[in-house]
Amino acid sequence: MREQDFLNHFLKKGYFKKHAKAVLALSGGLDSMFLFKVLSTYQKELEIELILAHVNHKQRIESDWEEKELRKLAAEAELPIYISNFSGEFSEARARNFRYDFFQEVMKKTGATALVTAHHADDQVETILMRLIRGTRLRYLSGIKEKQVVGEIEIIRPFLHFQKKDFPSIFHFEDTSNQENHYFRNRIRNSYLPELEKENPRFRDAILGIGNEILDYDLAIAELSNNIDVENLQQLFSYSESTQRVLLQTYLNRFPDLNLTKAQFAEVQQILKSKSQYRHPIKNGYELIKEYQQFQICKISPQADEKEDELVLHYQNQVAYQGYLFSFGLPLEGELIQQIPVSRETSIHIRHRKTGDVLIQNGHRKKLRRLFIDLKIPMEKRNSALIIEQFGEIVSILGIATNNLSKKTKNDIMNTVLYIEKIDR
């Protein structure tokens, strides 16, 4: 194939339409060197600014020499190159994580929004077969994604439709360790695939076909279930067990860096069915929050070391606090003004709940913890609820409950009003 054919494919797919700067992961192998040649030659046509990034894994004697040659190559092409050296105990997983962490650092430093890798169809076959042997979930058998958004960056794999044999023989570095069967991927490439191709010469095409078919099913299910609110458990549980599993898995597809194992997926299912309220860290910085008939999966938010100080409000004063306007003894106009009887004799304290808080109702003291459970108040709302306190006792839990003192006591003590208006809607 000609370089022009690859360029035409890139333009037709519109890989770089949304990107002005792209980082190329340059290993020095045939695939990445040819991708470098195409991208550097046709930067203007693709309308991108190319940046190179290389990781020296320090696993071979030749790696330092290769690093120097890549520096020369970048200088000749007048392109910036960033290089990092791997250290510590080597494994495929550690090396992969190190590479992607480094690439993200380079992107942040340069303002690039796309990471380009030279994965091709042969890599795709190996990946699908590896996952199948390891017993991965069905959705992961669709293989490597051609385009994948992770956070604020997009990973682009423009060679995924081409086999290695489609690339011309150009200057590159041969990694001799690829011939050794120490690593799983090498055993797949050097031993398992050749044996399977003896049974079916078109085995690679068959594997790619299965991957594409699974991807089609995933996309179709996502489209058909678009109007189903999976986070509403009443709605989710109205379907059969099989449909629930498929809908839940489709929902999890929204989080590309949350790759749950079968055991972790089963654990999530169990929590949704058995817990009324639960907060559970899952994986990769995500947590599951279950609140009665609703749940959500989100990134774990950093918690402040210290809670906000309580607010003290004096008579004949107003203050805006956490989305509300509080007016002590000064009437507010409007249809949605809350009014709470209070005393003018002392200041009002507005705060969040504390351990041991109680509210007097019908002459009985009730712990807030028990009150929240009885009223089925979600955990998030419990933590954000505003407590209005006077004379050392809770007068009201805003929007939830009020201290219902007897009429006689109210007439004696409650001689003014705290007016409250929601101002952050």
UniProtKB/Swiss-Prot annotation:
Binding site for ATP: S27, G28, G29, L30, D31, S32
GO function term, MF aspect, one: tRNA(Ile)-lysidine synthase activity
Compartmental location: Cytoplasm
CDD domains for this protein: TilS_N (cd01992)
SUPFAM superfamilies from the UniProt entry: Adenine nucleotide alpha hydrolases-like, PheT/TilS domain
Class of this enzyme: ligase
Keywords, alphabetical: ATP-binding, Cytoplasm, Ligase, Nucleotide-binding, tRNA processing
InterPro entries documented for this protein: Lysidine-tRNA-synth_C (IPR012796), Rossmann-like_a/b/a_fold (IPR014729), TilS/TtcA_N (IPR011063), tRNA_Ile_lys_synt (IPR012094), tRNA_Ile_lys_synt_N (IPR012795)
Catalytic activity, EC: 6.3.4.19
Chief site of localization: cytoplasm
Function: Ligates lysine onto the cytidine present at position 34 of the AUA codon-specific tRNA(Ile) that contains the anticodon CAU, in an ATP-dependent manner. Cytidine is converted to lysidine, thus changing the amino acid specificity of the tRNA from methionine to isoleucine.
Entry comment, domain topic: The N-terminal region contains the highly conserved SGGXDS motif, predicted to be a P-loop motif involved in ATP binding.
Protein's name in the database: tRNA(Ile)-lysidine synthase
Species annotation: Streptococcus pneumoniae (strain CGSP14)
Gene: tilS
